[in-house]
């Protein structure tokens, strides 16, 4: 008999090859580091499942994972699993909260939608403190143009134009519920997008295309044409990885209610 554990983790994606293990073996992934730490805590081999895979250099504030262990965990006896796990993790990875999850919970398959955020420093000079955590654009950006083009992202559409080449999936249709640009503070803007799911590098490709249209002075409605084309070559280049954050993963309320906090 096994116990299923759900937990959230934040990480600085700098220096990692992404969430998933990669070849050659000398590349270090976020999942690999967490699995090794969990194996030390539970004294058994742990296999980790996450809500999704982030690329090299991409960060997360609330990545959701689950694993199963042969250790029996009593939810009535408070055990700070996150404290135990963090003692085996580097400072760039932090376990935030943990629960005993029901058998039908799955970090990947149970997720209903996700929110990502992209940060851009828009100043004449780059930021020494944000260079690993945001893109830098020197020339002034017309945020109204970006916001206007983002309206064409909303709804249930085929986003094949924003799928990176070489990553085939059976279905490229996704539903976008929210897509907004705003100033986070003077000189720093953010793009927040919530959807039912995202294709590989989809958010970075959307941001890169939005900036491309704005810089070239093309009408924001061009975004609609690019989506309709279902052709990656019609879209702009991807924005750099370091500006992207996985902010939140959503699950059915029923599943959330049946998770017992540790």
From Swiss-Prot:
CDD domains tied to this protein: PseudoU_synth_EcTruA (cd02570)
GO biological process, alphabetically ordered: tRNA pseudouridine synthesis
EC number in record: 5.4.99.12
Reactions catalysed, as given in the entry: uridine(38/39/40) in tRNA = pseudouridine(38/39/40) in tRNA
Gene3D superfamilies: Pseudouridine synthase I, catalytic domain, C-terminal subdomain (3.30.70.660), Pseudouridine synthase I, catalytic domain, N-terminal subdomain (3.30.70.580)
Residue ranges of the TM segments: none
Active-site residues, as the UniProt record annotates them: 55
Keywords: Isomerase, tRNA processing
Top-level taxon: Bacteria
Keyword tRNA processing: yes
Residue positions binding substrate: 116
GO MF entries: RNA binding; tRNA pseudouridine(38-40) synthase activity
Keyword DNA repair tagged: no
SUBUNIT field: Homodimer.
Protein family: Belongs to the tRNA pseudouridine synthase TruA family.
HAMAP family membership: TruA
Function recorded in the entry: Formation of pseudouridine at positions 38, 39 and 40 in the anticodon stem and loop of transfer RNAs.
Record NCBIfam families: hisT_truA
Identification of the protein by name: tRNA pseudouridine synthase A
Natural source organism: Bdellovibrio bacteriovorus (strain ATCC 15356 / DSM 50701 / NCIMB 9529 / HD100)
Lineage: Bacteria, Pseudomonadati, Bdellovibrionota, Bdellovibrionia, Bdellovibrionales
Gene designation: truA
